[in-house]
């Protein structure tokens, strides 16, 4: 997503739920406004919410339907999130075949 970043796993929740985890306050609520988000200072992801699977599916479908951009990185307006995504993009680049042949990517 271009305005929030979180992880979704099937951990520590009921069979009909998923655990949505985020590092930044507010990211979960951007997509799941009714979520009961808890902060856990001892966890690698500070913010967590158990959310029903059908709610997750509907929300993610809504996010897909909302896509209008032709370039993901250019659509991210939050500077801190953009910088994080850019680092991930650069780190994943070498997984692509012939990545090192692209001169513009030599800096990564």
Put a short name on every predicted segment.
Residues 1-108:
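Structured alpha/beta or helical-core interaction and ligand-binding surfaces enriched in interleaved
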